[in-house]
Amino acid sequence: MSGHGTSVAAIAAGNGRGSVGGIYAGVAPESELLIVKLGNPRREGFPRTTELMQGVDYVLRKALEYRMPVAINISFGNTYGSHEGTSLLERYLDDMSNYWKSVICVGSGNEGTSAGHTSGMLKEREEQRVELGVQQREPALNVQLWKSYVDEVDISVIGPSGVRVGPISERLGTQRFRIGGTEILLYYGKPSPYQTNQEIYFDFIPTGSYIDSGVWQIVLTPRKVVTGIYQMWLPSQSVLNQGTAFLNPVSSDTLTIPSTASRVVTVGAYDARSFSYADFSGRGALEKNAEMWVQKPDLAAPGVRVTTAKAGGGYGEYSGTSFAVPFV
């Protein structure tokens, strides 16, 4: 998935005939593959999670039709959501994990060192500033802030030039304002049947070709605090310019979705040469119930400089949790 299907499939079941002595054969070279292509990745726009659900449904129905067990490899992830296992996609995968003779394995993502996540604790009458560095020639950017719906927070935004807009209180619909050459859309989300936390969504759109570079600040001004915990995520590092990141990142809670589903096997990456966990590999904790938290990933597999087949022929070295999943 996401443009590396050939390499992932070769790790799982490649015959190794293109290498001397078959040294680069896959983990299970005699196994049969059922390939589902979702489409090409897009730089702009939301991930196609509904297409992923359709793909999983197709594979499970075929496995039942053929009366064969199936291991589903999902080398795909995104950062859009509360990361609590409560979205429609995550719950769907949890349900499908109980269907037929199946196991669903998902990569934990490569956001561990991307500086794309931060978090904190709100306190009444105490303003908090979250600093975000934006590199030059960044064509667009969005930021998610997730908090308890019972906490009430006003938002201000300070641009690289020092211009401040806000505080902006919650209201229905999208609020628009402009700082320099960047238009900002701010949306306060509402609870849903799948999500009781609130998302505050920021969309940075250039009035020209690129949004203003430099240090942006998102200012949180609490009006009422009950739980106080907030989390913030950027898009995956693969769609951002290098260096666009939170200036005070938090490396916990860097799992990508849907590896946050509780019943899937979440696979992290380790370096098979040094036997150390890969620093880029996502990690985090999911709340199983009021008294128990489950740590993810569930296990780790080789995911650093893995030699596997390339699309078009030959072999190459690849790193990432996408390449750890097919080992499982």
Identify what each model region corresponds to.
Residues 1-328:
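Loop-rich non-cytosolic ectodomains and luminal regions
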